[in-house]
């Protein structure tokens, strides 16, 4: 059994939580949604991990919007950078105080009907690369330093979550499958010991 230790109310959906660099980072919507497609501002809060106190953030900052608001919206923390999957807007990277460092959005993100083609759902950050599960656009691997695309793999289903381990890239797709890739024609990831 589990004992509830703490419950912290937020004005809108709690979207994701990540731990890294001695910090706990949370993402939540600033208000309740009227519809799932609505773009809603969100807040990122940064807490000291050692304190385990989620009521008193060291820093908090507003993220312009999360659209649609019913997406995965994974957050990752590495090298004192916060990576936020903002759905239609792509992946945004901030420092711990909330200053935007860079962002990636797929090319030509809007279709002829005026709708977004794909959503940045999940991300994983290694020592050398940033991996994005970019919905129907597929898996995108970016060089962490130059922010350039190193590889991209589109498949039929929507890429939702991604993790890299020992040179293998694991992607969870929305409709019943896990797919494993290995990066070729590029330097290997350095986030593991050989």
Predicted regions and their residues:
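Short loop/turn segments that connect beta-strands within beta-propeller blades
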Residues: 1-3, 48-53, 95-99, 143-147, ...
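Repeated scaffold domains used in trafficking and secretory/extracellular systems
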Residues: 11-21, 67-78, 114-124, 157-166
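Loop/turn-rich, solvent-exposed surfaces of beta-rich toroidal or solenoidal domains
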Residues: 114-141
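Blade-level signature of beta-propeller repeat domains, shared across WD40, Kelch, NHL, RCC1
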Residues: 157-194
């Amino acid at each position: 059994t589990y004992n509830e230790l703490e419950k912290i109310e937020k004005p809108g959906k709690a979207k994701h939580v990540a731990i890294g660099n001695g910090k706990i980072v949370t993402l939540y919507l600033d208000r309740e949604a009227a519809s799932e497609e609505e773009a809603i501002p969100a807040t990122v809060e940064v807490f000291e991990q050692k304190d385990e106190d989620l009521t008193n953030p060291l820093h908090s900052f507003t993220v312009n919007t999360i659209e649609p608001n019913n997406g995965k919206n994974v957050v990752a923390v590495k090298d004192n950078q916060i990576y936020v999957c903002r759905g239609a807007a792509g992946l945004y990277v901030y420092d711990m105080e909330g200053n935007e460092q860079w962002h990636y959005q797929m090319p030509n993100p809007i279709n002829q009907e005026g709708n977004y083609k794909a959503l940045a759902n999940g991300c994983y950050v290694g020592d050398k690369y940033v991996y994005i599960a970019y919905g129907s656009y597929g898996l995108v691997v970016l060089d962490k330093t130059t922010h350039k695309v190193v590889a991209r793999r589109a498949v039929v289903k929507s890429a939702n979550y991604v993790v890299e381990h020992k040179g293998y890239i694991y992607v969870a797709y929305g409709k019943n499958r896990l797919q494993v890739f290995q990066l070729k024609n590029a330097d290997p990831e350095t986030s593991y010991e050989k």
